């Protein structure tokens, strides 16, 4: 069983190496100090601190947008245009800029295009009803705008499911894909049964009616920092209205129809998507390869350096083994 200190360090994203470092420097962390850190984390000021980490600018990123049929899609181009093209897709609530360091690492070998999906980041919500095919259409719209005939796709969480949709509806456009800590239907969601989560069995829930979820508070502040606070409020209302219809809903037959080679990366300590579900997904996709990153949490797998290094290595080796 984890100690109070270990639970708090996990909450604050201080890993085992960090704990040993503190001990080696004779830094004494007593219970009062830990409680102070916890109070800080739950306070308004610390939500701002973590929000600032989600809006770090992407080094040498070029922001662009394309408008089509009532929706404006924002995207960021990073890396040498002569390198192989790679489209990156973020998770729910997040946006491209939230993955700045991860994208910069991908751009070492690829021309990366990070797309803010509808209602996320700086992209507008649009008026068309949500569908899995619509998200795939949006990605193809951006690819066509940039003249990308064929490309690689890397998606985290909801972005990994979007990859499945692109592979299903536009298999001729995707060379290979990478799905990180993702799922293929709602059964893969690890619901938090307490009344403070933003994903429930009845759909997305925001922080109205005295509900309190600090992840949402952090994202609220992050969106305000990029000038999209009002839009994000609208996005949350739309997501609440969709109920469970916004959740992934592919069947086994859908996965078996996918021919695109896909690397499935599992976060070993995923607290959002059930690892066993993601493993099962890899078995159902014919041309898939499975990698498990032991100890990695859902978001930490693409945010913490020790896990990021492993994931980037897997991606580079899978997409272009001889490169």
Placement of each model-derived feature along the sequence:
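Conserved HGGG/HGGXW glycine-rich cap/lid loop of the alpha/beta-hydrolase fold
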Residues: 77-122
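Active-site loop/oxyanion-hole signature of alpha/beta-hydrolase fold enzymes
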Residues: 117-151
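Flexible "cap/lid" loop of the alpha/beta hydrolase fold
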Residues: 164-169, 177-208
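Conserved alpha/beta-hydrolase catalytic His-Asp/Glu region
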Residues: 188-194, 202-257
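Short beta-strand/loop motif that positions the catalytic acidic residue
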Residues: 258, 264-266
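Short alpha-helix in the alpha/beta-hydrolase fold that links the catalytic acid
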Residues: 260, 274-283
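Acidic catalytic loop of the alpha/beta-hydrolase fold
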Residues: 269-273
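Catalytic histidine-centered segment of alpha/beta-hydrolase-like enzymes
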Residues: 296-308
């Amino acid at each position: 069983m984890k100690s109070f200190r270990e639970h708090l360090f996990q909450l604050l994203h201080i890993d085992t190496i960090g704990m040993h470092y503190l001990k080696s420097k004779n830094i004494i962390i007593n219970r009062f100090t830990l409680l102070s850190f916890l109070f800080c984390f739950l306070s308004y000021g610390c939500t701002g601190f973590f929000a600032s980490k989600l809006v770090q600018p992407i080094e040498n990123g070029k922001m662009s947008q394309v408008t089509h049929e009532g929706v404006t899609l924002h995207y960021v181009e990073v890396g040498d245009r002569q390198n192989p093209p790679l489209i990156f897709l973020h998770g729910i609530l997040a946006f491209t800029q939230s993955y700045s360091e991860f994208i910069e690492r991908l751009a070492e070998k690829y021309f990366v295009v990070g797309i803010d999906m509808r209602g996320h980041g700086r992209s507008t919500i649009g008026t068309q009803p949500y569908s899995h095919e619509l998200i795939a259409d949006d990605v193809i719209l951006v690819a066509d705008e940039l003249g990308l005939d064929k490309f690689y796709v890397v998606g985290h969480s909801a972005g990994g499911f979007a990859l499945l949709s692109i592979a299903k509806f536009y298999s001729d456009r995707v060379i290979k894909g990478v799905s990180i800590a993702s799922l293929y239907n709602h059964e893969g969601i690890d619901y938090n049964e307490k009344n403070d989560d933003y994903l429930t069995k009845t759909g997305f829930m925001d922080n109205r009616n005295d509900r309190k979820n600090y992840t949402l508070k952090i994202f609220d502040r992050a969106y305000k920092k990029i000038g999209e606070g009002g839009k994000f409020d609208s996005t949350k209302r739309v997501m609440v209205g969709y109920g469970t219809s916004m959740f992934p809903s592919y069947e086994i037959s859908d996965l078996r129809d996918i021919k695109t080679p896909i690397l499935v990366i599992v976060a070993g300590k995923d607290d959002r998507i059930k690892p066993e579900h993601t493993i099962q997904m890899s078995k159902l996709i014919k041309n898939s390869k499975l990698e498990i990153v032991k100890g990695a949490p859902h978001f930490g797998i693409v945010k913490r350096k020790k896990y990021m290094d492993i994931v980037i290595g897997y991606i580079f080796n899978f997409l272009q083994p001889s490169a």
